[in-house]
Swiss-Prot record:
Name this protein carries in UniProt: tRNA N6-adenosine threonylcarbamoyltransferase
Alphabetical list of CDD domains matching this protein: ASKHA_NBD_TsaD_bac
Cofactor: binding comment: Binds 1 Fe(2+) ion per subunit.
Keyword Metal-binding attributed: yes
Source taxonomy: Bacteria, Pseudomonadati, Pseudomonadota, Alphaproteobacteria, Hyphomicrobiales
Job of this protein: Required for the formation of a threonylcarbamoyl group on adenosine at position 37 (t(6)A37) in tRNAs that read codons beginning with adenine. Is involved in the transfer of the threonylcarbamoyl moiety of threonylcarbamoyl-AMP (TC-AMP) to the N6 group of A37, together with TsaE and TsaB. TsaD likely plays a direct catalytic role in this reaction.
Length: 365
């Protein structure tokens, strides 16, 4: 039986600075002792997106104090912690350096093992923390940097079934919002405007719908939104609402096709898993209610459980990083050495083909 374990988690991959202390008992159950997150929204909102240098500086200024807060709220000291888990990628390299170097320093000073965690693995394993989910299951990761459909076979065993060939879904939301003059972050702003819009007004494209492969594409949709806005400029509030509603509908129908095919593939490959199969949604875009409703209906139709962890655990947080470290410890994975380096790109499925899209970000993890 795996012994009781406690770990300090650190997350600095983008624009949230976070620290958490999490326990895992012998039966595999989780207890979150503390969860501290500091958002950098105010620092980046004026620029309409995350500025890497500003993000890195903010992590430097905040991280030490957040770690102290996490330990204090958990009522533990470093002596009571069994290991350190820090995000090592993928993400913005400046932020990753801050978090990983801090984790290394703590591990060295306190004599604790270090686990360098893939941020995507944190998202992929969160449902085991919140719902005690058994392997295998599917994860749809939708965020500002990633849109991936991942098969989770076990800890450290991941297959990427689909990914974006250009823009991530969260990126498409943010750029659409900026185009329409809406505030950052764009996802919530677009969702709010869409509530009062006519989704039938614009027939936006649904890229890759009908194709057998399970990849995604959103750059063409973004271009169609720009063209529609230019055609009817200047835009009234109702025009903006209608564009947002039509944009969301196109995304919902795209996901319905892409994920629906993924669910069917899962049932073919795992015809009898012993329990109802599950689809987990994670990432900041998972907060979108229309997206959740679409996925819930799709799961109901196909006989799947639909699992959406609490929003605080869908967006970037250190709890999931600590939990991923605990899962790795429990399965006997050796800790990392102190010469481990951060990686701005770090595919969760090391065997997956690198896709080259047409977005500004180049190769997609």
């Amino acid at each position: 039986m795996v012994p009781f374990m406690r770990i300090l988690g650190i997350e600095t991959s983008c624009d949230e600075t976070a620290a958490a202390v999490v326990e895992r008992n012998a039966e595999g159950h989780c207890n979150v002792l503390s969860d501290v997150v500091l958002s950098q929204l105010d620092e980046h909102s004026a620029y309409g997106g995350v500025v890497p240098e500003i993000a890195a500086r903010a992590h430097v200024e905040a991280l030490d104090e957040l770690i102290e807060q996490a330990l204090k709220r958990a009522n533990v000291s470093l002596a009571d912690v069994d290991a350190i888990a820090a995000t090592s990628g993928p993400g913005l390299i400046g932020g990753l350096l801050v978090g990983l170097m801090t984790g290394k320093a703590i591990a060295r000073a306190a004599g604790k093992p270090l686990y360098a965690i893939n941020h995507l693995e944190g998202h992929a394993l969160t449902a085991r923390l919140t719902h005690g989910l058994s392997f295998p299951y599917l994860v749809l990761l939708v965020s500002g940097g990633h849109t991936q459909l991942i098969l989770v076979r076990g800890v450290g065993q991941y297959e990427r079934w689909g990914t974006t060939i250009d823009d991530a879904l969260g990126e498409a939301f943010d750029k659409t919002a900026k185009l329409l003059g809406l505030p950052y972050p764009g996802g919530p702003a677009v969702e709010r405007m869409a509530r009062d819009g006519n989704a039938d007004r614009f027939d936006f494209p649904r890229p890759l719908v009908g194709e057998a492969r399970l990849d995604f594409s959103f750059s063409g949709l973004k271009t169609a939104v720009r063209q529609a806005a230019q055609d009817i400029a200047p835009l009234s509030d109702q025009d903006v609402a209608d564009i947002c509603a039509s944009f969301q509908r196109a995304i919902s129908r795209t996901l319905k096709d892409r994920i629906g095919r993924g669910l069917q593939r899962f049932k073919r490959e795992f015809p009898a898993t012993g329990e109802k199969p599950a689809l987990v949604v994670a990432g900041g875009v998972a907060a979108n209610l229309e997206l959740r409703a679409t996925l819930q209906a799709l799961c109901d139709k196909n006989g799947f459980r639909f699992i959406a962890p609490p929003l605080s655990l869908c967006t970037d947080n250190a709890v999931m990083i600590a939990w991923a470290g605990l899962e790795r410890m429990a399965t006997g994975v050796a800790p990392d050495t102190l010469d481990v380096q951060p990686r701005s790109r770090w595919p969760l499925d090391a065997n997956a083909e690198t896709l080259i899209g047409f977005g500004k970000r180049g190769a997609k993890a």
